[in-house]
Structures are given as C-alpha cells and as structure tokens.
Regions:
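C-terminal catalytic core of tyrosine-transesterase DNA break-rejoin enzymes
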Residues: 61, 65, 71-72, 179-202
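Basic, Lys/Arg- and aromatic-enriched nucleic-acid-binding interface segment
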Residues: 6, 13-70, 74
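Phosphate-coordinating loops and pocket residues in cytosolic domains that bind phosphorylated ligands
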Residues: 16, 36, 75-76, 83, ...
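Short basic/aromatic active-site micro-motif
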Residues: 53-56, 149-152, 169-189
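Active-site/catalytic core of tyrosine-dependent DNA strand-transfer enzymes
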Residues: 102-171, 184
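Helix-turn-helix-type domain boundary/helix-start signal
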Residues: 4, 24-25, 99, 145, ...
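Catalytic-site neighborhood detector that most strongly recognizes the C-terminal catalytic loop/helix
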Residues: 25, 90-94, 192, 199-223
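Conserved tyrosine-mediated DNA breakage-rejoining catalytic core shared by Y-recombinases
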Residues: 5, 13, 25, 71-130
C-alpha cells in the first residue's frame, strides 16, 4: 500500500489469534520444598539475613487450599471466616465459594490473625482498630494498614529469588503466587465439574485453563 502496489489492505478483518497465557504452576515437590523453606525462614528474626516475612507461608496455604488469587488473599477480612470454612470472595466474574476448614488452613488463618494483633497492639503504637469486621483485613502491613497487592507481589519475588539462590528450587521449578491457584484446582479431587465448583468458575472453559491434570481413562472394549 505504501508504494502503490496494493489498493486495499488484505489484512482488514483478520484478527490476531489469542495465545494461551503461560502458567507457572509448582510441581508438588517444589511446592512442598518452598512452603517448608518459607516456614523455616519466617522463624528467623525479622530483617535478619536470609529471613522472610512470616505471612508468606500462611498466604501460600490459603492461596492453594482456597484456590485464591493474590488480590483475593489480600482482601480477606474477618467476615470471611465462617464456622465451617472460608468464604472465598472471588474476582473476574467467578462465583463465591465456601471452602471447608482443614488443619493447615486453620493454622494459616490463626497465624495471620496473631501477626495482625501483634502489629495493631505493639507498644507505643496508637493504631485505631477498625470496628466493622469487613474493615479488619487479615493481611496487613507493618504500619497496620491493609497490605497492597503490589507489596505482596514484591515480597514474593524477593522470597522466590532467595529460594533459588539457596538451592531450594531450580530456575525451571520457579513458580508464581498465582500458580498456587492452578495447583489447588488441579489437585482438587473429582471430575471437571467438581473442580469447576471448587474454583467458582462460571464456564468449563475457564476451569480447563487451570486444571492441568492428565485424565486417566479406561481403554475401549472390543465388541
């Protein structure tokens, strides 16, 4: 068209093919190693060399077990704790779900509450504790204010790089925080419909993006 050899654009009406986003889901072994590492390094003195924030291990557990995005973990508050489980309030059009408690989830929730209480009641700090339960976020900064998703992402990147430097996982085993949701959905017991319900997905196609399990099927019968 620029040199006058073509009077019309032959590409008009052609749409670019959508490429599936790459996921960084951890292998079961990598997940276990990194979770153990997070718990070990959280036991060190804060800001000591090689330490990591104490909230990372509980965040990993909740992101995996409740199949949550990072932002959905950040927005958990006291109203989401129910007698029978965690009310997962989901984004991007997904349905809310109630995930039944298991011992690891209970421990993770309690650890984050203890951490929040310690920050809010620290000596010399006059922090106004929110009266409404929906305003009491589970995950808070050292200032006592709700933790921003960007802060969680930055902490995760520093931690996962530390895990690789320490030889806990290789670069090929590196995974994202969002990858824990992929692993949680993939590990859900049941068929694709069960996984769709657990994830809160509206369509089976969305579940297909998160479920990476290889179907086990029976061979055909010969008549």
């Amino acid at each position: 068209m620029r040199v006058g050899l073509c009077r019309s654009n032959p590409a008009i009406g052609v749409r670019q093919a959508r490429e599936a986003k790459k996921h960084r889901m951890p292998t079961p072994a990598a997940f276990d190693k990194v979770l153990t590492f997070a718990r070990e390094r959280a036991s060190l003195m804060p800001h000591a060399k090689g330490s990591c924030p104490s909230y990372l291990a509980p965040v990993m557990v909740l992101a995996y077990s409740a199949r949550l995005r990072g932002i959905e973990v950040c927005t958990l508050n006291d109203t989401h704790k129910q007698p029978t489980g965690i009310h997962a309030q989901r984004r991007k059009g997904s349905r809310d779900t109630l995930i039944e408690w298991d011992p690891e989830m209970i421990e993770a929730w309690d650890l984050l509450v203890e951490r929040r209480t310690a920050i809010w009641t620290k000596n010399g700090r006059n922090f106004a504790v929110p009266i409404k339960a929906e305003d009491r976020r589970l995950l808070v900064e050292q200032t006592g204010n709700p933790m921003a998703k960007s802060s969680l992402d930055s902490a995760w990147q520093r931690f996962i790089k530390l895990a690789m430097r320490e030889g806990i996982i290789s670069n090929q085993e590196r995974f994202s925080l969002h990858g824990l949701k992929h692993r949680g959905i993939t590990n859900t017991v049941g068929n694709r419909g069960d996984k769709q319900d657990a994830a809160g997905h509206v369509t089976p196609e969305m579940t297909g993006r998160y479920d990476h399990a290889l179907p086990v099927v029976k061979p055909p019968r010969r008549s």
